[in-house]
Amino acid sequence: MSQSDYYEVLGVGRDADENELKKAYRKLAMKYHPDRNAGDTKAEERFKNIKEAYEILSDPNKRAAYDQFGHAGLNGGMGGAGAQGFSDAFSDIFSDLFGMRGGGRSSVHRGADLRYNLEITLEQAARGAETQIRIPRQEVCDTCHGSGAKPGTSPKTCPTCNGHGQIRMQQGFFSIQQTCSHCQGSGKVVSDPCGDCHGAGWVKRQKTLSVRIPAGVDEGDSIRLTGEGEAGANGGQAGDLYIVIHLASHPVFQREGNHLHCEIPISFTVAALGGEIEVPTLDGHARIKVPAGTQTGKIFRLRSKGITGVRNQSTGDLLCHVAVETPVDLTARQKELLEEFESISQKDGSRHHPRAKSWMEKAREFFAE
């Protein structure tokens, strides 16, 4: 037992009445409660002293003994009539700390948010679009206007919790509140339910909504429609609808941020001799000059031919990746010409095929080691 002066511990005078004691105790207990001072041993010790002081001074018999004889007059006992007063006060503190004071939970609840996955084309993402979607959701019953009761009647106060929505369970010094199982926390019960919603206050319906897709949206972006989620309970506001964007695969382009990529196959003759080719863009077509000797993997960048982002408003590029295509199903004449070309190239192949020469030199060095 602490030997501190109990009146000083609570910060009250020796003539303090019951209300002053309780007010001082509640204020100090909330300040030094272990749940608010995790790991603070000094606060924990202070809390124990505060609890001990209030238990003694809130019991008239113990307080009288303490006032006359000090700590010696207590004889170690901490039970007796004051325990109930301590329990009530401590349960008030516990309720304040964990948000359980007052008339139980509010019966007004916000509706749940909904998620809808929307697949769009690359063109829709780039240019923006407007589309319609159908979603199943809870809506307030038009017949009972959300009360759940048959028209002409109204919900009654729950007799189990007296309308609080919660019931209090006493366990030793602690008082724990639990949701009332009779009214499920609403504080009301419906004895004559609505025939359309069967007492729920809401019905399930298919809702058609128009959705405007802003230009530049990307995979995983979401569009929030406020108030288009599930209906709230007992007058609570509706939740929100989150539309999550997914991009359908495109036959030509692949998106990377605001940039677009595409593969451009060219013949080996165009690659060798050079030329001009036409490539697709989101807006139509563009022409590219291919220099002689172009190899597979060469990238041609078309500035500002990508997508304008929805957030930063910067426009990406179109990157065209060259793939030199080897001809197949050759005619006899084509084979003859290629064989003639190969024969001529053999005389000075290193000049015409610099990469092959470099590779051969590296291979010889490797095997020579």
From Swiss-Prot:
What would be the name of the gene that encodes this protein? Answer: dnaJ
Q: Which GO terms describe its biological process?
A: chaperone cofactor-dependent protein refolding; DNA replication; protein refolding; response to heat
* Stored CDD domains: DnaJ (cd06257), DnaJ_C (cd10747), DnaJ_zf (cd10719)
Matching entries from Pfam families are given as: DnaJ, DnaJ_C, DnaJ_CXXCXGXG
How this chain assembles, per its entry, is: Homodimer.
Name by which UniProt lists this protein: Chaperone protein DnaJ
Q: Where are the CXXCXGXG motif repeats?
A: 141-148, 158-165, 180-187, 194-201
Task: Return one GO MF term.
Answer: ATP binding
| Similarity remark | Belongs to the DnaJ family.
**What cofactor is needed?**
Zn(2+)
Q: Where does Zn(2+) 2 bind?
A: C158, C161, C180, C183
According to the lineage, what is the superkingdom? Bacteria
Function summary: Participates actively in the response to hyperosmotic and heat shock by preventing the aggregation of stress-denatured proteins and by disaggregating proteins, also in an autonomous, DnaK-independent fashion. Unfolded proteins bind initially to DnaJ; upon interaction with the DnaJ-bound protein, DnaK hydrolyzes its bound ATP, resulting in the formation of a stable complex. GrpE releases ADP from DnaK; ATP binding to DnaK triggers the release of the substrate protein, thus completing the reaction cycle.
- The UniProt entry's coiled-coil ranges are none
Cofactor notes: Binds 2 Zn(2+) ions per monomer.
Organism, per UniProt? Nitrosomonas europaea (strain ATCC 19718 / CIP 103999 / KCTC 2705 / NBRC 14298)
- The segments annotated as CR-type zinc fingers are 128-206
Signal peptide span: none
Q: Which amino acid positions bind Zn(2+) 1, per UniProt? A: C141, C144, C194, C197
Domain J as annotated: residue spans:
5-70
